[in-house]
């Protein structure tokens, strides 16, 4: 089972200079609750951003895979050079956690989308390429002020 998890605003904005364009504790708590201790896949920029955020603390994931076209020896992660081959052949639960290129490369292979819809419009420079969410089935939805947590099944 492959999951992808991200937050986006009304314009499908997901980032600003390699960080989130917002700081909403409920969204951060949801992301942590969903991914903590899990096997994750992310791009190199996302990895470096998280390492900067957590500083000396270990990242809160089980197994960590980092997509990079270059061969890199990460101290706490395995390098993945061919993301598409990796997700097509990976047999266990996997959480795709960013960034944009990794989401878009893996989207055809993802079984469940966990999207936090951040109500409103924010400033940033990284937008998710639009796709038809209606091709997915909404299987779970929770609303709180300013956010909609939605899970979609392929």
Where is each model-derived feature located?
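Enzymes that bind and transform nitrogen-containing heteroaromatic metabolites
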Residues: 1-154
């Amino acid at each position: 089972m492959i999951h992808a998890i991200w937050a986006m605003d009304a314009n499908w904005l997901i980032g600003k200079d390699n960080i989130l364009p917002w700081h909403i504790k409920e969204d951060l708590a949801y992301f942590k609750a969903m991914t903590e201790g899990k096997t994750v896949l992310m791009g190199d920029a996302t990895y470096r951003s998280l390492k900067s955020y957590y500083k000396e603390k270990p990242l809160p994931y089980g197994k960590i895979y980092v997509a990079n076209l270059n061969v890199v020896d990460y101290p706490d992660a395995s390098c993945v050079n061919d993301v598409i081959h990796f997700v097509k052949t990976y047999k266990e639960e996997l959480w795709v956690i960013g960034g944009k290129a990794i989401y878009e490369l893996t989207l055809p292979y993802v079984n469940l989308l966990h999207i936090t819809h951040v109500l409103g419009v924010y400033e940033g420079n990284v937008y998710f390429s639009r796709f038809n969410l209606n091709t997915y089935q909404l299987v779970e939805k929770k609303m709180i002020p300013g956010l909609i947590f939605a899970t979609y099944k392929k």
